[in-house]
Amino acid sequence: MAVTLTENQKKNPLYKYYELPIDPVPKELAEKIQKMSHDDAEGMAYADINKMFDDGYLPCEFGLFHNPDGGSMVANLTDMPGVTAEMFDWWFAWHGLDTMRYIIWDKEDHYYCQTQNVEQALDSSLSMKERYWNTEHEVKEALSDDMEPVPARLTFVPPEVIGFDPEKLKSFKGTIIATPGPLLMFHFLRPTANGSELRSRFFVGYMATENGIVRVPAFPSDDEKGRTMLMHNVKEFSHLAKILPDLYNEYKDNFTVGLDPEGDR
């Protein structure tokens, strides 16, 4: 069921994107995910994340995994035809300014989003990366239709903060969205012949600190939570892949579209 909008949100120019259908996870894929377990296969040690820069694919591109260093991981791979690194950076700089932007990403599960760094996000003297690096988003989302939405705070940092090699980043043609924890995650977008592909990783039991990546106490690998997270990630990023090229072309130079001066965000 779609998130209910306020009257002001219904008047938002982005409403046409809200009206677009959001596809469920394909039946065969959903059935495959529901059979997955963290015990099925070994993932990657966090220290090996710079292998993401290598050509080709790793054995752990999609599914639930136990890692050799003791943690666990959820991984997803999303084809994004027509999407570029510039679009993806723009999206993470732009969408945190207004809840309606977050809702159209996944209108069934996304309820609220507000960057805590509005001036930084609106600062046109900064690059798109600089407009979301070292910022915090307050969000409210559900991971499935039968779950209640819960609040969370997401911090976005430069990828080297979570262990990516600064030298490799200099020549990388894609982009990496990095969140240091308490659930350490990153979205590694790299170019393809028809656009980009997104390699998402969620590491349970890890956190980025001033002293580097540390292992932290974590609940035992929960297969049900892992499957729910993967299903949600498949749905939301598949939909973003569909709408992002048009959104970017229409609003890439408009960071204030639909912003309500009365604060109905």
Q: What label would you give each PLM region?
A:
Residues H66-M87:
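Terminal, regulation- and interaction-focused segments at domain boundaries
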Residues R101-Y112, N254-L259:
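Short, glycine/acidic-rich hinge or "gate" loops at secondary-structure transitions
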Residues A2-P68, T192-R265:
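Terminal "cap-and-tail" regions of soluble proteins that handle hydrophobic small molecules
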Residues G71-M73, P182, G195:
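A general secondary-structure signal for short beta-strands and their flanking turns/coil
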Residues L77-T78, L183-P191, R201-V204:
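Hydrophobic/aromatic beta-strand elements that line small-molecule binding cavities or substrate pockets
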Residues K107-P180:
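Glycine-rich portal/gate segments that line the openings of hydrophobic small-molecule binding cavities
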Residues P81-Y102:
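Amphipathic alpha-helical segments
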Residues G82, F164-E167, F188-E197:
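A short, structured loop/turn motif at beta-sheet edges
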